[in-house]
Each structure stands twice: as C-alpha cells, then as structure tokens.
Amino acid sequence: MSLLLEPSQEQIKEEKLYQQMGVSDDEFAMIESILGRLPNYTEIGIFSVMWSEHCSYKNSKPILKKFPTKGERVLQGPGEGAGIVDIGDNQAVVFKIESHNHPSAIEPYQGAATGVGGIIRDVFSMGARPIAVLNSLRFGELTSPRVKYLFEEVVAGIAGYGNCIGIPTVGGEVQFDGCYEGNPLVNAMCVGLINHEDIKKGQAKGVGNTVMYVGAKTGRDGIHGATFASEEMSDQSEEKRSAVQVGDPFMEKLLLEACLEVIKSDALVGIQDMGAAGLTSSSAEMASKAGSGIEMNLDLIPQRETGMTPYEMMLSESQERMLLVIERGREQEIIDIFDKYDLEAVAVGHVTDDKMLRLFHNGEMVAELPVDALAEEAPVYHKPSKVPDYYKEFLETDVPAPKVEDAKETLLELLKQPTIASKEWVYDQYDYMVRTNTVVAPGSDAAVLRIRGTKKALAMTTDCNARYLYLDPETGGKIAVAEAARNIVCSGAEPLAVTDNLNFGNPEKPEIFWQIEKAADGISEACNVLSTPVIGGNVSLYNESNGSAIYPTPVIGMVGLIEDTEHITTQHFKAAGDLIYVIGETFPEFAGSELQKLTEGKIYGKAPAIDLEVEQSRQKALLKAIRSGLVQSAHDVSEGGIGVALAESVISSQRLGAHVTLAGEPALLFSETQSRFIVSVKKDHQEAFEKLVKDADLIGEVTSDSVLAVQSQEGQQWIHAQTEELESAWKGAIPCLLKSKA
C-alpha cells in the first residue's frame, strides 16, 4: 500500500481498521491514551505486532511467572535472545526453543526452514557459536495425503536450511495424532557454546551510539507474521501466505560468521536478531531493555523491493537480518568486517536518551512512540479458567487393561505406529555429523556432542507426550519434564536446565486457559524438584483449526552435562551375557498409551501417575551408577512400555537378543507407568549395581542369538521374535505409510 493510499488516523478509528491487525477496541483506546492522540497507520501497525501474543505474551505472562528461572549455573534467564548456563572452565551453553507452527501449516518448507534460521540467530546473537539443532514436530495421522505432504515438506525444510548452514541437526521427536491435522507443530531448538567474556546482550546503550542494520535486504515477506501467529487457523489462513518468510541459509552462514567476528570487537555494544515483528521488535526491545530510545531514518534501510512504506519496512519479517548498536565513531571497523563476508552493514540511526522510538522517512517523522509502551507495557490478561467436562469424566472412568491375545503381534503393531516407529527416514535427511562433534547420533534417548579441547560433552533432547497432557495437564506437565531428564540421564549426563515451548489452543476459551495453567503448574513443580530451571522459551497459542484445538503440547527442551566422555551411554545393549534390569515397578496404567490408541482408537481415562521425589531418586541413583562405570546401556521406558523399550534396545548393528522373564499379565509389557528404565550391566558389576540402585529388578540377560524372548514367571512364552523381524517393522513403518495411497 502506497503512503498516499494509507488510511487517515480518523479512518483507522472510525472504521475500526485496527481490528484487522488483531487490536481490540479496548487496546486501541489504551494506545490513544498512551499517545494522547490517534495513532497513524505505521504506528498502529507497530503497536499491533508488539502487543500480539507472539511478541508480548499478554495472555501467558501470569503463567510464565510460575516457572523457576534461577539456579547456581544460570548466567542468563528469560528475557534475552536465549538462556545461558555455566558448564565450568569459563564455558557456557546457550540454548532456546521456538515455534514456527502457523507458517508451517501454510507453507511447510519455508515455514520450517525459517524456523530453524530464526532460532540459530537467537543463539549467535548472544555471542555463541551454534553447535546443534533439534526439532519437535507434531502432525495429524500419517494416513492423510495432506499430512504426508506437510510431513515431507517440513522435514525437507529443516534439512535444507540446517544442512546448508553447516550446523548438525542431531535429534528431536516426531509424534502423530489426529488433533494436529489442520495445525501441525514445528518447534526448533538450537544449542550453542560460548566463553563467558563473549556473552552479548540485546541492549541499545550509550546515547549517540550508532544503530546499524546488517544482513539481507528488507522485502515484503512476513509482514504481520507475529499477528498471524497469534490467530487461530481457518479456511481463510491460506490467504495469508505472504505472512510466511522466505529463508536463505547461505546468507545466514555468512551472517553467522560475520557476527561471531564482530562480537570479538569491543566496538559492539548490543546485538539482536530481527525475528518476529522484524525491525520493530529489535529496535523497541533493545531500547527498552537499556532504558534508552532510538531514532532511525528508514530511507537508509536496504530494500529489495521498490516503493516500500514505513509500515512495510517496520513490519517486514524478511530473514537473515540483525540490528547492532556500535560505539559512535567506530562504524567503519564493523562495516569492514561485514564487507569481508559480502554483507551490507548500514548505519540507520542512533541511540537517544528519551525512551522514544522515532522514525523518519522522506524527511518527515512518520512515527513517535514510547519504547516501554511497546516492549513492556502491553496489556496483561488474566483469562477466566474452567475445568473441562471431559476431564471430570476421565477422573471417574476406569480404564481396563486391554486384552492382549498375542503379545508378539501386539509388539510388532506398536513398533509400526508412526509415533514409536524409527525416525530414520527423517534424520537420514539431516547432516548430523557435520563439524564431527556428534558422538551419539539421532536414534538414542538423547543426542550427545563432545566439547573439543575438554573431556566434557553435552546431551540434549526434546520431549512431550501431549496425550497425557490432554488427560491431565498438570500430571502431563510433570511427566514432560521428567521424561526429558530421564533421557538426559540415560545418556550419562546431569540435567542442567530447560527451555520450553508452550503450544496450546485459544486462551480465550476458559477450558484451554485451564489447560495452560495446570500444565505450567506441573512443569514448575517438576523443574523445582529436578533442579532444572527454565532459562527461556516460547509461547505459541491459538493452535486451532476450524475451532478445534490441538492437545496441550508444552515441549520441553533440555540440555545436560557429561563431565567425562567415558560416561557417555546409549540405549543399545552392548554384549551377550550382560544382565538386564528394569528400574521401577510396573502398574496397569494404559490411559493415553500407544496400546490404548491402537486397540480402542481413542484415548481416555486418568493419566499415569508420577511421584517426582521417586523420579529424582531413581535418576540420581542411575546417574551415579553410570558415572561409576557400572552401566552398559540405559533406556527410559516411555511410549509402548517395557515391550517397546526392550525391542529398541536389541535393535542395533550388533544384532543381539534378550531373554527376559516378567511378572503379571502380557498387557503389562505395554503399560506406560512412569519413572522406569531398562538397564544392562556386566555380570562382574552385579553386586555393586544392585547395592547402588535399590529399585532395580533383574529380569533377564542379553543374548547372542538375535532373538527377543519374553516369558511369564510361570514359563509361558509371550514373545519370541527375531531381532531382524522387529527391526523391519520398526524401520519400515514410516517409509511404508508415506508410499501408501490413502
């Protein structure tokens, strides 16, 4: 829209044009009161993105305050581009997770690709070199042609961006449920390494210092992307394809290297990614955090399209752009560095002392707004909360143990379920070995990367079983954190901290807001008990399509520290003759389980219980045993229960088997009782291990016959399956489903 065609201030108010930008009548009245006048078109556009849920967290701020954010190792908590945790020796790990859900539903390749690009920029804007990317993905049932298309394109987008930029994509999770049919979830996590002295903040300090724009030119892609991400999906969402950004990983690679070089210069005062809301959020947030203001001349903004208006320039979410604040008089040093990488670096403004964002275009001031009103003073809503009727019903519903007539066939069917099946089809498209630091590749409980020049390594994972959260958000929230920590411990690492991605439906619906509140309560309690503070994250609400919400899906990203690479552990059995233990009791808990979905086609009932004190005790004991050199392999028991955990432990290049004896009914093989592990131990270490891990029960032995044999204590054979048969079912499921015609 040309400046001449933009509506007047009076038109904006009288015709309520602000509503099209997601601004309510009450919010418009607040804006008018703050300014003491009517906003113009550029100004209301700026307010609309800064006050969107995506940027302001106006519906979720009261919830986020519940999370523990401090800890002995925490160097930077929520509020910056990414959180930072000390790992000793003057080093720190930087990590964060973010969503790109709505864009990926409309334009899956670019939506996923730019999600990866954005989270990488958040990490290197802190001064860290990104070392790994993970992702947590949710789709509808893989029998749907539309879902197959979204799945293939999202994975291709992640691979296309990550592989080109040279950062390994090392892990994550993919789950499939009907509720994600119209609203897939694409959450990307990035992990980086930094020395303490290189930590940078996104702050515009120093009156008179230069504001510099670096990176790609600004186009019209992604305008109102932040607003789009704060709405429900509908049949009309397809029309908002222009709100999806377009990425260039080769440009990002150059930008990454240039920024890491600039960070070494003391001429750099502050740096921030132009992410959601682009130039608007980066300038307003950097000024607000520093207690300063910013003036910019928009005529100087590098543009790849002609005739762009101030509104378009400020709201564009074109990718691969950063905003820097440089010491006055030292601009050329920075320009020279970016020039070396063939990147533009342009002085576009300066820092002021009056806490105002002033924008000039063609010699005229086109916006004058208080930065704190934009960045810190968005309205905060305490939404009404209501217990859903379905939850009350589930509490009263008895869930009978499913009848398992043939345990072997049931196991094979479970291994073919897309949520359980091997994700090799996915990660084979990712370059997970680039930079050669990946020690444990995708396919185990957590990915592990060594830290060069030390004996240390980092373990990383993403986790969330949304079915449990649907049944009981508070219990499910606890389980999400506990399972992430379990996966970290099974790799030989001590859990350090959490980054969370809260994916929920429309918070204006009281039943949905109740889910958000309860899930946050569960996550907070688990983080407190397990000593894993929340150092940052993302909130993605309005994940609904045509009025139907996704399951509550607060994805937990977690990083752990391995002090000595000799302690690195994987889930695969290592040698015939090793003893197999299960840590933890098994109860008939099938609500929300893969077996329940397989046999009944739906999930219902009371979520599996979790005792966080027991969870912590078992994790500590297992980690101590691993660090003492007593454990050959460790695998957490999750979807599909002990049966699936045993199958996954025998499926490895060594083609080992396992002979196991269990108590109870065959269905218990597939119960999803929490806080359990499958562990293998050398016979020489039996006494020491049992002394250390009190909750461990000896259930069998690793064998060389490539057979998984499971029998009852009375000697009744439940399962006798060749490892090759299990592997074929597990590895072949997703490729087979993708080839099939619906």
Swiss-Prot record:
Q: Name one Pfam family in it.
A: FGAR-AT_linker
What InterPro entries does UniProt report for this protein, alphabetically? Answer: PRibForGlyAmidine_synth_PurL (IPR010074), PurL_linker (IPR041609), PurM-like_C_dom (IPR010918), PurM-like_C_sf (IPR036676), PurM-like_N (IPR016188), PurM-like_N_sf (IPR036921)
Gene Ontology terms describing biological process: 'de novo' IMP biosynthetic process
Which cellular components does GO assign to this protein?
cytoplasm
Q: Where in the cell is it found?
A: Cytoplasm
Give the residues annotated as coiled coil. none
Report which reactions are catalysed by this protein: N(2)-formyl-N(1)-(5-phospho-beta-D-ribosyl)glycinamide + L-glutamine + ATP + H2O = 2-formamido-N(1)-(5-O-phospho-beta-D-ribosyl)acetamidine + L-glutamate + ADP + phosphate + H(+)
Predominant subcellular localization, coarse grouping:
cytoplasm
- Please provide, alphabetically and separated by semicolons, the GO molecular function terms listed in this UniProt record: ATP binding; magnesium ion binding; phosphoribosylformylglycinamidine synthase activity
Q: Which family does it belong to?
A: Belongs to the FGAMS family.
Q: What does this protein do?
A: Part of the phosphoribosylformylglycinamidine synthase complex involved in the purines biosynthetic pathway. Catalyzes the ATP-dependent conversion of formylglycinamide ribonucleotide (FGAR) and glutamine to yield formylglycinamidine ribonucleotide (FGAM) and glutamate. The FGAM synthase complex is composed of three subunits. PurQ produces an ammonia molecule by converting glutamine to glutamate. PurL transfers the ammonia molecule to FGAR to form FGAM in an ATP-dependent manner.
Record's protein name: Phosphoribosylformylglycinamidine synthase subunit PurL
Its gene is purL
